């Protein structure tokens, strides 16, 4: 390479170094400005994060308190339901009690009047049962024994098919499909 070319290359190299130094200086100046600008944005973000965290914590506490209130209210409703479960039936039974008390107060000795009073009482009791969905289990002779609703009290020799109802000793009752008392029945067994 010639001296002139070397000198030209040296001058270009010096110019490039100066240009790089200028860019770095400008870059550093911009970086300082960017860093200075970034710090307020960072602080704003930190403040916003703290604000959102506080808001979230407040919402969590409110949700927890609401859940506890709902649980307490639900438990109170269950307790009230148990406490007053028989209220409807009790109200329905009041006229029955009234009729029985009137029958005891009757001093006439009239058997027909007493019988009529008992019939009225039975009618009121049946109304109370209907209103509270208490149904009779009253199987007929020949019905198949159902252990879910019948209780075999005795077995008797009969011409009927075995394990069928021969007679009813006491009626059974259900409350909304739940057996309160099974019907107490006599069932047929094979003749010996």
Curated annotation (Swiss-Prot):
- Keywords, in A-Z order: Chaperone, Cytoplasm, Stress response
UniProt-annotated location(s):
Cytoplasm
The species is: Neisseria meningitidis serogroup B (strain ATCC BAA-335 / MC58)
Provide a Gene Ontology MF annotation, just one.
unfolded protein binding
Q: Is Chaperone given among the entry's keywords?
A: yes
What's the protein here called?
A: Protein GrpE
Location (main, coarse): cytoplasm
Q: Which gene encodes it?
A: grpE
A GO CC term assigned to this protein in UniProt: cytosol
Classification via InterPro entries = GrpE, GrpE_coiled_coil, GrpE_head
Family (UniProt): Belongs to the GrpE family.
Gene Ontology biological-process entries: protein folding
Q: How does it assemble?
A: Homodimer.
Which stretches are transmembrane?
A: none
């Amino acid at each position: 390479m010639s001296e002139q070319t070397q000198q030209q290359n040296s001058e270009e190299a010096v110019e490039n170094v100066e240009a790089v130094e200028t860019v770095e200086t400008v870059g550093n100046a911009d970086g300082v400005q960017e860093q200075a600008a970034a710090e307020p944005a960072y602080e704003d973000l930190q403040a916003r994060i703290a604000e959102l965290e506080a808001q979230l914590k407040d919402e969590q506490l409110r949700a927890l308190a609401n859940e506890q209130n709902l649980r307490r209210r639900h438990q109170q409703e269950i307790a009230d339901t148990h406490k007053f479960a028989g209220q409807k039936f009790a109200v329905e039974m009041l006229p029955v009690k009234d009729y029985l008390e009137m029958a005891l107060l009757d001093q006439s000795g009239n058997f027909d009047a007493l019988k009529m009073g008992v019939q009225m009482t039975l009618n009121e009791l049946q109304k109370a049962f209907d209103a509270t969905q208490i149904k009779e289990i009253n199987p007929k002779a020949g019905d198949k024994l159902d252990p879910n609703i019948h209780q075999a009290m005795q077995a008797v020799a009969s011409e009927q098919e075995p394990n069928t109802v021969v007679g009813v000793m006491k009626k059974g009752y259900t409350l909304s499909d739940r057996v309160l008392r099974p019907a107490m029945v006599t069932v047929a067994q094979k003749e010996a």
